[in-house]
Amino acid sequence: DEINRIYGPRDYQDPNIIYPLDWRNPQSHAIYWAAQGLKMGSKTKYNTHEINSDRIVFQSMQALYRSGRIVVFPVDEGKAYSVFEMPDLRMYETCRKAYVDTIAKYQDMPGRTAMTIEGLRVGYRNFLANSAFSFYQTGHVRYAQRIFAELQREFPDQDKYKVTFGQFIRNRMAEEMEAG
């Protein structure tokens, strides 16, 4: 199915392995309908509806990355259940590609403001930093190091990333502790 091929979560060990979206999540439905709107919508490039539909897809993918894994845990001897939403790290590559593609798509948009692209780039920078930390926290250290290297490559002017990977992790842990 095309929606899963384009927007589905990927195995971070092998991005050629694509999983289906979890339709229990409302974000999966938002992606589906926004993608339909992009496909069927106006053929005028850069119209407001296209930009808004791209935003819906983009924000829904980020939501799936942050909390799209649904875990149902039986309690009270199976008579009741607790439902937990957890990060779905398999959405990393899909989200990363969406950032790169969306930045490229609107880079040459006539009349675009610098804020449009700069806002996307700031979001991308934060996404990479958060992802490096998330993968580290879940024990995927090598993958976290690759993400951190990409962060340094894409944002060489950012002093806070001109550190070793270990120092980056220590700094992030300190930030998390201070935030409470």
Where do the protein language model's features map onto the residues?
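Extended ligand-binding clefts on enzyme/binding-domain cores
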Residues: 1-126, 134-139, 178-179
